[in-house]
């Protein structure tokens, strides 16, 4: 559920990742120091800005694109990247589109990407750099060894952040079962979850850019984060003001700047608490997060439980008969919920002692 721009960037990087035919062709052009301008798409919008050149209409191969890049013009690939359609073309985008790029090749690439919304790749002849444009996204591809170093460094940072998050969440677990949670405890847990997810998002971009070289990083990442984002969303559902859309709240929290996310007031405002003293305000969870930890409890049953009992405390104090009366819960499931919550509480208290 990360922001759309990040999702779009990841999808672009997957197309250009090491190990793909496209990336092999780009690396060949880079090593030859010829420079190049490549458009990934053949829609009507693109063909409107294409002038001159000649039709190739041949199967894509890294060696073909390398040879064609020796000519000055742009190369047009089909949308599925399987064919080279045109070579040595001139691109004539709308000159009124603003761009802050300097070289002719990069200015053209930026304008074409903004005008058509397709991926345009500019390979610098002098600086030996591959730059990718799409809409208002600009990304410079880096060497795999540099990316691996950055990814490993980010993983080490993530490990420390996850350790802090675990302590904060364990504390929240105990307070929830004792029904003495304050807004400060909740906002701290949500803040820590968001900080972890921001590092995760950064590492995911590195993994996309590394392609098949990022497998080990991906495995380590999955082992570290497990259900962090899901639990964070359940926290929002547990504590946001009634009738607020939790997806919208999560989106707002993601949009908070890196500096402002350190301030709990920004998070509490997104959750619907304005001008409320965080440390002194007690609040009870609805119970989504704890119920999600009980095996084989569908989302509809969780919704029905929260609708009927309002708070986790009430669900825990309900008898088997009370639970049985809730829609979607029979005798067996009532027992599973009651026993599941009891075991969860015991486990959390035991873990805290050690």
UniProtKB/Swiss-Prot annotation:
InterPro entries: DisA, DisA/LigA_HHH, DisA_sf, DNA_integrity_DisA_N_sf, DNA_integrity_scan_DisA_link, DNA_integrity_scan_DisA_N, DNA_integrity_scanning_protein, RuvA_2-like. It is an enzyme of class 2 (transferase). Gene3D superfamilies: 5' to 3' exonuclease, C-terminal subdomain (1.10.150.20), DNA integrity scanning linker region (1.20.1260.110), DNA integrity scanning protein, DisA, N-terminal domain (3.40.1700.10). Its EC number is 2.7.7.85. Residues 6-144 form the DAC domain. SUPFAM superfamilies: RuvA domain 2-like (SSF47781), YojJ-like (SSF143597). This is DNA integrity scanning protein DisA. Its cofactor is Mg(2+). Keywords: ATP-binding, DNA damage, DNA repair, DNA-binding, Magnesium, Nucleotide-binding, Nucleotidyltransferase, Transferase. GO terms for molecular function: adenylate cyclase activity; ATP binding; diadenylate cyclase activity; DNA binding. It catalyses: 2 ATP = 3',3'-c-di-AMP + 2 diphosphate. NCBIfam families: PRK13482.1 (NF010009). One of its GO terms (biological process) is DNA repair. ATP binds at residues 73, 91, 104-108. Participates in a DNA-damage check-point that is active prior to asymmetric division when DNA is damaged. DisA forms globular foci that rapidly scan along the chromosomes during sporulation, searching for lesions. When a lesion is present, DisA pauses at the lesion site. This triggers a cellular response that culminates in a temporary block in sporulation initiation. It comes from the Bacteria. Pfam families: DAC, DisA-linker, HHH_2. The lineage of its organism: Bacteria, Bacillati, Bacillota, Clostridia, Eubacteriales. Homooctamer. Belongs to the DisA family.
């Amino acid at each position: 559920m990360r922001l759309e721009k990040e999702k779009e960037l990841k999808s672009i990087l997957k197309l250009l990742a090491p190990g793909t035919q496209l990336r092999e062709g780009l690396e060949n052009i880079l090593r030859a120091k010829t420079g190049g301008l490549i458009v990934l798409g053949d829609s009507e919008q693109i063909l409107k800005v294409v002038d001159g050149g000649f039709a190739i209409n041949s199967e894509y191969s890294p060696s073909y694109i390398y040879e064609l890049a020796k000519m000055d013009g742009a190369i047009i690939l089909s949308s599925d990247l399987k064919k080279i359609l045109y070579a040595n073309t001139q691109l004539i985008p709308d000159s009124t589109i603003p761009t802050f790029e300097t070289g002719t090749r990069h200015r053209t690439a930026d304008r074409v990407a903004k005008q058509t919304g397709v991926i345009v790749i500019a390979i610098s002849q002098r600086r030996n750099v591959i730059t990718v444009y799409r809409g208002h996204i600009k990304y410079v591809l880096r060497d795999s060894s540099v990316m691996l170093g950055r990814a490993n460094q980010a993983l080490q940072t993530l490990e420390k952040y996850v350790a802090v998050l675990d302590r904060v969440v364990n504390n929240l677990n105990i307070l929830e079962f004792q029904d003495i949670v304050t807004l400060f405890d909740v906002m701290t847990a949500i803040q820590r979850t968001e900080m972890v997810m921001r590092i995760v998002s950064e590492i995911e971009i590195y993994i996309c850019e590394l392609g098949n070289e990022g497998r080990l990083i991906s495995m380590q990442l999955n082992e570290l984060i497990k259900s962090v984002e899901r639990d964070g969303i359940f926290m929002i559902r547990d504590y946001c003001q009634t009738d607020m859309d939790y997806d919208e709240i999560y989106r707002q929290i993601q949009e908070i700047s890196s500096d402002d996310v350190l301030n709990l007031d920004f998070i509490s405002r997104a959750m619907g608490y304005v001008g409320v003293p965080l440390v002194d305000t007690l609040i009870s969870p609805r119970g989504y997060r704890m119920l999600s930890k009980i095996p084989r409890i569908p989302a509809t049953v969780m919704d029905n439980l929260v609708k009927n009992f309002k708070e986790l405390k009430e669900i825990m104090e309900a008898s088997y008969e009370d639970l049985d009366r809730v829609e979607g819960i029979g005798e067996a499931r009532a027992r599973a919920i009651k026993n599941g919550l009891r075991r969860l509480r015991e486990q959390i208290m035991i873990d805290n002692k050690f």
